[in-house]
Amino acid sequence: PALPEDGGSGAFPPGHFKDPKRLYCKNGGFFLRIHPDGRVDGVREKSDPHIKLQLQAEERGVVSIKGVCANRYLAMKEDGRLLASKCVTDECFFFERLESNNYNTYRSRKYSSWYVALKRTGQYKLGSKTGPGQKAI
């Protein structure tokens, strides 16, 4: 799960943006980072400019996640890799859900059993290796 900086989430109206935030993974203590070259990973430094993310509601409970500095969108590919796309595609939409532990989970809309996750090393976890209730995010 990722803990948004505003302390929580709920569905917000389609077409609206949330204030830029950082998504934190309790497992390993990493913030999700989107690089300008399209790489995605985790970093512990709160001051890293590439952890500032803009979430936009596409429909109720569905968001796109854009790296503010990278100007790229988080995407999950058909092989489960996470990367950052210059354009919004159907692989850039995620179901956002506030879990009982007050962390948000982000599940791919296109590959509906796969979640955004970081390993304890800060590398992203393949979507095919994720599931609900996972410790990695």
UniProtKB/Swiss-Prot annotation:
Positions of heparin binding: 27
GO cellular component, one term: nucleus
SUPFAM superfamilies assigned: Cytokine (SSF50353)
Posttranslational mods: Phosphorylation at Tyr-73 regulates FGF2 unconventional secretion.
Subcellular location(s) of the protein: Secreted; Nucleus
Keywords: Angiogenesis, Developmental protein, Differentiation, Growth factor, Heparin-binding, Isopeptide bond, Mitogen, Nucleus, Phosphoprotein, Secreted, Ubl conjugation
A molecular-function term among this protein's GO annotations: integrin binding
Phosphotyrosine PTM sites in chain numbering: 73
Source species, domain of life: Eukaryota
GO biological process: angiogenesis; branching involved in ureteric bud morphogenesis; cell differentiation; positive regulation of angiogenesis; positive regulation of blood vessel endothelial cell migration; positive regulation of cell division; positive regulation of cell migration involved in sprouting angiogenesis; positive regulation of ERK1 and ERK2 cascade
UniProt subunit comment: Monomer. Homodimer. Interacts with FGFR1, FGFR2, FGFR3 and FGFR4. Affinity between fibroblast growth factors (FGFs) and their receptors is increased by heparan sulfate glycosaminoglycans that function as coreceptors. Interacts with CSPG4, FGFBP1 and TEC. Found in a complex with FGFBP1, FGF1 and FGF2. Interacts with FGFBP3. Interacts with integrin ITGAV:ITGB3; the interaction is required for FGF2 signaling. Interacts with SNORC (via the extracellular domain). Interacts with glypican GPC3.
Stated family: Belongs to the heparin-binding growth factors family.
Name of the molecule in the record: Fibroblast growth factor 2
Source organism of this protein record: Oryctolagus cuniculus
